[in-house]
Amino acid sequence: MEWSTLTTIFDTSLAVVFTWVAYKTGQIIWKYTPYSYPNARIRAMEARLLTDQRFSELAESKSLQNFVVSLEDTDYGKRLTSLQSYNIEDVERALDLSLVDVIELMVKIMPKRIKGLFEIMLEEWDVRNIINVVKAKLSNMPPQDFIMPAGKMLQKVKAMAEAKTMEEMLVILEGTDYEEPLRRLLLNEITLQEFELELYKVHYSKLLRYVNSRKGEEKIIASEFVNMLIDYTNISTLLRAKLSSLAQEDIRKLIIPGGTLSKSTIEAMINSEDVVMALGELEGTKYGEVLREVREAVESGNIESVEIALRKYILRRMKELSQFYPLSVAVAVAYLLQKESEVRKLKAIAKLIEDGVKPEKIKEMVGELA
């Protein structure tokens, strides 16, 4: 074989190798680089999460005003320092809005290919606001008092609050995913509880469609997260329905499509004799081990213990994924879950202080939350 031929073959081989290396390098850069800045920022935010010692100190607050002042040097300071008064409703709203601020930040800093997850998560506030406005209207209460300034449809929600009739509210929602449930409510085809459920079904279906349209690690992580949220909601709803002795057919209407639980497991829970038997049907699922620990609490009618155990499980799982995929959306989701837990604890402390509960009891009660 001539030397020129060998050179040509060698050059061609090198070109193929370099092209492959460039392609793989490009893939790695596309896959991981967009997460470098946001995840570094989130890790810094994680360092500012409140410690158990800080929660203990907050529980010692003599009043709501002391509680608020103690949080002024934290990430909650921005919202809390703007309060005009120190009543529990305003404090809770400020804490909720601090959580909204975090989700909005995720929308801004996360890669375009996954930011839609957080945009849809913000839409849950649209669902809450619409439900609150409708309930207020039907109860002849001022709907403006129940609107949280959050979500993507805030202007429509405010217009609904100003509407003089329910029919006007329906016109305002025309063309949205929430128009049909409200129409059915006005025609008395569904109850107010079913209307609320329909809106949440719309919300979770949006989340599912979005995560299922992702690729690679984003799909793996986001899909597991959303399906666990649906499992959490279905388990909580089903157990509470069982505790209230709701008819099996009525319970079936409450189940949100999706999740990791099989149809046979859901059906077995629905057909079970009581709430403890329903809980037992989860023994063979991934939630079986953590729920086994709260069986006694459920026997006494404490469904909140199940919800706490499930929230802890979901957070632990997302933390595991954030360690396995350090440059991924798992870091943001795990942080958001920690922030939700923190806000939940702060709201509980604030309410207990308002109710005059002793500090030691507050520490005990809040320590059990997640």
UniProtKB/Swiss-Prot annotation:
Gene Ontology CC annotations of this record: plasma membrane; proton-transporting V-type ATPase, V0 domain
S-S bridge residues: none
Keyword Transport applies: yes
Domain of life: Archaea
GO terms (BP aspect): proton motive force-driven plasma membrane ATP synthesis
Alphabetized UniProt keyword annotations: ATP synthesis, Cell membrane, Hydrogen ion transport, Ion transport, Membrane, Transport
UniProt-annotated location(s): Cell membrane
Cited Pfam families: vATP-synt_AC39
Membrane topology: Peripheral membrane protein
Subunit composition and interactions: Has multiple subunits with at least A(3), B(3), C, D, E, F, H, I and proteolipid K(x).
Family statement drawn from the similarity comment of this UniProt entry: Belongs to the V-ATPase V0D/AC39 subunit family.
Function description: Component of the A-type ATP synthase that produces ATP from ADP in the presence of a proton gradient across the membrane.
NCBIfam families for the chain: AhaC (TIGR02923), PRK01198.1-5 (NF002269)
Name of the featured protein: A-type ATP synthase subunit C
